[in-house]
Regions:
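Short acidic, Pro/Gly- and aromatic-enriched capping/linker segments at domain boundaries
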Residues: 2-14
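A short glycine-rich, His/Asp/Glu-containing loop-to-beta-strand
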Residues: 20-40
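Short histidine-centered beta-strand/loop micro-motifs
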Residues: 25-26, 44-49, 66, 77, ...
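Glycine- and acidic-residue-biased ligand/ion/polar-headgroup-sensing regions
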Residues: 40-41, 50-69
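Portal/gating segments that form or line small-molecule/metal binding sites
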Residues: 65, 73-83
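Conserved metal-binding segment of the jelly-roll/cupin
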Residues: 82-100
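A short hydrophobic beta-strand segment most commonly corresponding to one strand
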Residues: 102-118
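Conserved small/polar residues in nucleotide/adenosyl-binding loops
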Residues: 129-136
Length: 138
């Protein structure tokens, strides 16, 4: 069994609406935390939430974090390399994620606690186009 299939099975991960797989591992009124897994052929579609989210790198290949506050100017950062193992996305910021290798396993902490009504997905055509167009900026 591949490491990706093992992670999904062992942690009982399910498909996430933005792409990849996840499992919620902690929740209270103040904060939520999930494990989030992206394989090489997946990306997290452009989305934004109404709360601040911190990404924590756990294993696999480094992860590109694409962000845009206004949908016009874009930034690419990487977590999981060069001693950079976390990244915070401010509330309302558009962002997308892409593994640089076979897979990336991260944690996502949202405060106050995440609810799915906090999530806004960009149209998939827009998501795909912008991610591919800006992939080489890093």
């Amino acid at each position: 069994m591949s490491i990706v299939k093992k992670l999904i099975k062992d942690h009982k991960m399910i498909p996430h609406p933005e792409g990849g797989h996840y499992v919620e591992i902690f929740r209270n009124d103040d904060v939520t935390h999930i494990y989030f897994l992206l394989e090489a052929h997946e990306n997290s579609h452009w989305h934004r939430i109404t709360k601040t989210e911190t990404l924590h790198f756990y294993s696999g290949s480094p992860l590109n974090v694409y962000t845009s506050k206004d949908g016009v100017e874009f930034q690419i950062d990487e977590i999981g390399s060069n001693n950079n193992f976390m990244y915070t996305v401010e509330k309302g910021t558009w962002f997308a994620l892409k593994s640089t290798g076979a897979y990336s396993l991260i944690g996502c902490t949202v405060a106050p606690a995440f609810e799915f009504e906090d999530l806004e997905l960009a149209p998939k055509a827009v998501s795909y186009t912008h991610l591919r167009a800006h992939e080489t900026l890093g």
